[in-house]
């Protein structure tokens, strides 16, 4: 089947509609292409899938051979399926929204990080739908170089995609479709005039992309500042205190003491206290907790000059977190120098901490990213957490993150969990990176090490090795 035959067949099955239609891009068009009807014509659907595949690969136009294909939801899904079956290429499916049950995945199917994916779409106007799919594929480690469509409406999609490094392949353009209909006598009179006027007015007019899909502004050049300088830039007093402590003690090592016995935790703190800047606790997992434990821990912290970080991960409304922070069995506000906070309740959660923070001088650490596999702290969520931190600098001392992003200001302490010399993972989804990689390549400030230290035979000696690796890597940046 050639292009002319295909266009006429689409017209025959009423896939080409004339009238007044509002496109996803917002443009009002006198012509609308509805390729959903092709699912009722299996031979035609198979022909479309094969023509699209040939356009990319059998003509040698592809940048890279795909390991997978993925259709943009929803019209392109049957096209991608036909392409997958006919050419024996595995397929992944992108959901428009993650399920709230089952696997809860946005991208379904078997794949591995770095696989190249051919994105399949029925037609493009601005390219927004394609870029939404590319964004979600990238979020799970998949790579995209090529996009194939049946129809390019010639209204900016090609430019938008190429600007972000993706090559667009189309079987035919809107101009070719219109010319075919004119030659076949299917488009005449007043309708022809309207369509022709529309094409003349909109040919290669770039439709603006939504802000979340527009090409990012160039990242500013990051000029690393030493901790003593950043202490002066911090609006939160605890952030300033931590920067100063790290600079004077020459350590940017935090240890996650995830132990369930209070004496074991106190012994660990005494053993490694001279090596660390922060000790991270989960007080609610301690089986034999009492107030004497807190008194002892504070004495050890004062003796060895480290701060206490309660990893509570508050996530409720402001009124509730106020009581969780200041009251109850643990009375966290009275002894924790810093606590972690999720942003799911919105920025109003910060208000719940204000009275306790003011009285005891502690700081909040917002969870912008996590080290666990499949974490939902990505994309827009991460962006909003950084914005929340920047808008509440007096209360927020820093971020829990996996990398420094341009919008993270110098007054925030960046702390990264999931650090081990052996950068692999565990059976429960934790993923590890080395101290050197986190401090130098990801450009964060504090490494958080847990089992790599407290499960070792000699925690103090191992802690010293992590301290040395992290501090020397930090110093090498200047």
Swiss-Prot record:
<keyword id="KW-0456">Lyase</keyword>
<keyword id="KW-0328">Glycosyltransferase</keyword>
<feature type="binding site">
    <location>
        <position position="371"/>
    </location>
    <ligand>
        <name>orotidine 5'-phosphate</name>
    </ligand>
</feature>
<feature type="binding site">
    <location>
        <position position="313"/>
    </location>
    <ligand>
        <name>orotidine 5'-phosphate</name>
    </ligand>
</feature>
<feature type="binding site">
    <location>
        <position position="320"/>
    </location>
    <ligand>
        <name>orotidine 5'-phosphate</name>
    </ligand>
</feature>
<dbReference type="GO" id="GO:0006222">
    <property type="term" value="P:UMP biosynthetic process"/>
</dbReference>
<feature type="region of interest" description="OMPdecase">
    <location>
        <begin position="230"/>
        <end position="478"/>
    </location>
</feature>
<feature type="binding site">
    <location>
        <position position="371"/>
    </location>
    <ligand>
        <name>UMP</name>
    </ligand>
</feature>
<dbReference type="Pfam" id="PF00156">
    <property type="entry name" value="Pribosyltran"/>
</dbReference>
<feature type="binding site">
    <location>
        <begin position="280"/>
        <end position="282"/>
    </location>
    <ligand>
        <name>UMP</name>
    </ligand>
</feature>
<feature type="active site" description="For OMPdecase activity">
    <location>
        <position position="316"/>
    </location>
</feature>
<dbReference type="InterPro" id="IPR014732">
    <property type="entry name" value="OMPdecase"/>
</dbReference>
<dbReference type="GO" id="GO:0044205">
    <property type="term" value="P:'de novo' UMP biosynthetic process"/>
</dbReference>
<feature type="active site" description="For OMPdecase activity">
    <location>
        <position position="311"/>
    </location>
</feature>
<dbReference type="InterPro" id="IPR023031">
    <property type="entry name" value="OPRT"/>
</dbReference>
<dbReference type="GO" id="GO:0006207">
    <property type="term" value="P:'de novo' pyrimidine nucleobase biosynthetic process"/>
</dbReference>
<feature type="binding site">
    <location>
        <begin position="430"/>
        <end position="432"/>
    </location>
    <ligand>
        <name>orotidine 5'-phosphate</name>
    </ligand>
</feature>
<comment type="similarity">
    <text>In the C-terminal section; belongs to the OMP decarboxylase family.</text>
</comment>
<dbReference type="InterPro" id="IPR011060">
    <property type="entry name" value="RibuloseP-bd_barrel"/>
</dbReference>
<feature type="binding site">
    <location>
        <position position="316"/>
    </location>
    <ligand>
        <name>UMP</name>
    </ligand>
</feature>
<keyword id="KW-0210">Decarboxylase</keyword>
<dbReference type="GO" id="GO:0045335">
    <property type="term" value="C:phagocytic vesicle"/>
</dbReference>
<keyword id="KW-0808">Transferase</keyword>
<feature type="binding site">
    <location>
        <position position="258"/>
    </location>
    <ligand>
        <name>UMP</name>
    </ligand>
</feature>
<feature type="binding site">
    <location>
        <begin position="450"/>
        <end position="451"/>
    </location>
    <ligand>
        <name>orotidine 5'-phosphate</name>
    </ligand>
</feature>
<dbReference type="InterPro" id="IPR001754">
    <property type="entry name" value="OMPdeCOase_dom"/>
</dbReference>
<comment type="pathway">
    <text>Pyrimidine metabolism; UMP biosynthesis via de novo pathway; UMP from orotate: step 2/2.</text>
</comment>
<dbReference type="GO" id="GO:0019856">
    <property type="term" value="P:pyrimidine nucleobase biosynthetic process"/>
</dbReference>
<dbReference type="InterPro" id="IPR013785">
    <property type="entry name" value="Aldolase_TIM"/>
</dbReference>
<keyword id="KW-0511">Multifunctional enzyme</keyword>
<feature type="binding site">
    <location>
        <position position="280"/>
    </location>
    <ligand>
        <name>orotidine 5'-phosphate</name>
    </ligand>
</feature>
<keyword id="KW-0665">Pyrimidine biosynthesis</keyword>
<feature type="region of interest" description="OPRTase">
    <location>
        <begin position="1"/>
        <end position="210"/>
    </location>
</feature>
<feature type="active site" description="For OMPdecase activity">
    <location>
        <position position="313"/>
    </location>
</feature>
<comment type="pathway">
    <text>Pyrimidine metabolism; UMP biosynthesis via de novo pathway; UMP from orotate: step 1/2.</text>
</comment>
<dbReference type="GO" id="GO:0004588">
    <property type="term" value="F:orotate phosphoribosyltransferase activity"/>
</dbReference>
<protein>
    <recommendedName>
        <fullName>Uridine 5'-monophosphate synthase</fullName>
        <ecNumber>2.4.2.10</ecNumber>
        <ecNumber>4.1.1.23</ecNumber>
    </recommendedName>
</protein>
<comment type="similarity">
    <text>In the N-terminal section; belongs to the purine/pyrimidine phosphoribosyltransferase family.</text>
</comment>
<dbReference type="Pfam" id="PF00215">
    <property type="entry name" value="OMPdecase"/>
</dbReference>
<feature type="region of interest" description="Domain linker">
    <location>
        <begin position="211"/>
        <end position="229"/>
    </location>
</feature>
<comment type="function">
    <text>Participates in the last two steps of the pyrimidine biosynthetic pathway leading to UMP synthesis.</text>
</comment>
<feature type="binding site">
    <location>
        <position position="320"/>
    </location>
    <ligand>
        <name>UMP</name>
    </ligand>
</feature>
């Amino acid at each position: 089947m050639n292009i002319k035959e295909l266009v006429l067949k689409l017209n025959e099955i009423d896939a080409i509609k004339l009238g007044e239609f509002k496109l996803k891009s917002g443009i009002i068009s006198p012509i609308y292409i509805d390729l959903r009807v092709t699912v009722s014509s299996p031979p035609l659907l198979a022909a479309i899938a094969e023509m699209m595949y040939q356009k990319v690969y059998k003509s040698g136009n592809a940048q890279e051979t795909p390991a997978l294909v993925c259709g943009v939801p929803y019209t392109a899904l049957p096209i991608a399926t036909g392409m997958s079956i006919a050419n024996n290429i595995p397929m992944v499916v992108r959901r428009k929204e993650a399920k709230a049950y089952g696997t809860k995945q946005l991208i379904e199917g078997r794949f591995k990080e770095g696989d190249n994916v051919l994105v399949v779409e029925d037609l493009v106007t601005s390219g927004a739908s394609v870029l939404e799919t590319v964004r979600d594929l990238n979020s799970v480690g998949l790579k995209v170089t090529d996009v194939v469509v049946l129809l390019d409406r010639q209204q900016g999609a090609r430019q938008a995609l190429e600007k972000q490094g993706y090559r667009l392949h189309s079987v035919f353009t809107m101009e070719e479709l219109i010319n075919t209909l004119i030659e076949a006598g299917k488009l005449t009179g007043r309708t022809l005039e309207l369509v022709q006027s529309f094409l003349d007015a909109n040919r290669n007019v770039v439709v603006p992309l939504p802000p979340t899909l527009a090409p990012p502004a160039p990242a500013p050049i990051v000029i690393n500042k030493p901790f003593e300088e950043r202490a002066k830039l911090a609006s939160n007093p605890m952030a300033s205190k931590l920067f100063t402590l790290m600079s004077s003690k020459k350590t940017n090592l935090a240890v996650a003491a995830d132990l369930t016995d209070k004496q074991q935790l106190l012994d660990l703190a005494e053993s490694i206290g001279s090596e660390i800047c922060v000790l991270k606790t989960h007080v609610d997992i301690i089986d034999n907790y009492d107030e004497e434990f807190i008194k002892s821990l504070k004495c050890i912290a004062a003796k060895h000059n480290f701060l206490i970080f309660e990893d509570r991960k508050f996530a409720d409304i402001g009124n509730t977190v106020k009581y969780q922070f200041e009251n109850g069995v643990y009375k966290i506000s009275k002894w924790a120098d810093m606590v972690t906070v999720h942003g799911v309740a919105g920025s109003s959660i910060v208000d719940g901490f204000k009275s306790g923070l003011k009285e005891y001088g502690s700081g909040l650490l917002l969870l912008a990213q996590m080290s666990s596999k499949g974490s939902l702290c990505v994309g827009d969520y991460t962006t909003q957490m950084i914005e929340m931190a920047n808008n509440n600098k007096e209360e927020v001392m820093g971020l829990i993150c996996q990398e420094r992003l341009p919008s993270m200001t110098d007054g925030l302490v960046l702390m990264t969990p999931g650090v081990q010399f052996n950068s692999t993972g565990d059976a429960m989804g934790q993923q590890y990176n080395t101290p050197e990689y986190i401090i130098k390549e990801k450009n964060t400030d504090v490494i958080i090490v847990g089992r790599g230290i407290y499960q070792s035979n000699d925690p103090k000696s191992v802690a010293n090795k992590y301290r040395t690796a992290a501090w020397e890597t930090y110093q090498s940046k200047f």
